[in-house]
């Protein structure tokens, strides 16, 4: 069930303050955050966020197409290394 429209998108306050400060100063520094749950709003366009994936911070550059999505969607938490090839010939010997 999606969030109610009357509530508006959720954005952590500390994250919004950091973006507002950078917009006032016209700077584009990387903003380190653990807030994967924050919704991307139009104020975030053009900023780079370092989103934590559980072990490191993944850089995410925000574009117009990302508005409305969550920051965590662009920082995958699981690394798939692939399945090991099943070598049937060596098992027979």
UniProtKB/Swiss-Prot annotation:
Presence of the UniProt keyword Ion transport in the record: no
Domain of life: Bacteria
Keyword RNA-binding assigned: yes
GO molecular-function terms, A-Z: rRNA binding; structural constituent of ribosome
A GO CC annotation given for this chain: small ribosomal subunit
GO biological process: ribosomal small subunit assembly; translation
SUPFAM superfamilies per the UniProt record, alphabetical: Ribosomal protein S19
Classification via InterPro entries: Ribosomal_uS19, Ribosomal_uS19_bac-type, Ribosomal_uS19_CS, Ribosomal_uS19_SF
The entry's keywords: Ribonucleoprotein, Ribosomal protein, RNA-binding, rRNA-binding
Protein task: Protein S19 forms a complex with S13 that binds strongly to the 16S ribosomal RNA.
Record-linked NCBIfam families: rpsS_bact
Family affiliation: Belongs to the universal ribosomal protein uS19 family.
Protein name: Small ribosomal subunit protein uS19
Lineage: Bacteria, Bacillati, Actinomycetota, Actinomycetes, Mycobacteriales
């Amino acid at each position: 069930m999606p969030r109610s429209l009357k509530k508006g998108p959720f954005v952590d306050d500390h994250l919004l303050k950091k973006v507002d400060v950078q917009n006032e100063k016209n700077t584009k520094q990387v903003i380190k955050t653990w807030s994967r749950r924050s919704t991307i709003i139009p104020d975030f366009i053009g900023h780079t966020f370092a989103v934590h994936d559980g072990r490191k911070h993944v850089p995410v550059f925000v574009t117009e197409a990302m508005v409305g999505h969550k920051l965590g969607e662009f920082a995958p938490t699981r690394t798939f290394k692939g399945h090991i090839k099943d070598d049937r010939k060596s098992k027979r010997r």
